[in-house]
Regions:
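Contiguous, often N-terminal, cationic amphipathic patches that form binding interfaces
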Residues: 1-74, 83, 95, 99-114
């Protein structure tokens, strides 16, 4: 990101951590998810590893696109949760980094059944 004073470089981990934090604070989200390459199963990530459930792609217009892989609680409205996540992630990432978010894509990989 270029400013009048110089260039600011934001590490990819900053974006993934902010996006993961914003998503997991939304109602009905159990946590971030990752699919195992060995067995194909979806695993719930611990708080310190939630960035693994997020992928950030840098666009040619200096904006970013964010893909989120999540687990949700049983009985929640997935459409409503996804809309809430998109709004929260876009807001927190833009507010924290000053980077425009061009897209937030939510992938519900699993539903927890207690």
């Amino acid at each position: 990101m270029k400013t009048e004073e110089g260039t600011i470089a934001v590490d990819n981990a900053v974006y993934t951590n902010i996006a993961g934090y914003a998503a997991t604070n939304c109602f009905g989200v159990k946590g971030m998810a990752v699919r195992s390459m060995t067995d194909g199963l979806v695993h719930l990530l611990r708080k310190e590893a939630m960035g693994k459930g997020v992928r950030v792609t840098f666009q040619s217009d200096n904006s970013i696109a964010i893909d989120l892989h999540i687990m949700v609680d049983k009985g929640v409205n997935i459409r409503a949760i996804s809309a809430s996540i998109i709004k929260e992630v876009r807001y927190f990432v833009t507010k924290s980094t000053g980077t425009e978010v061009s897209a937030v894509n939510v992938f519900v990989d699993s539903i927890t059944i207690d």
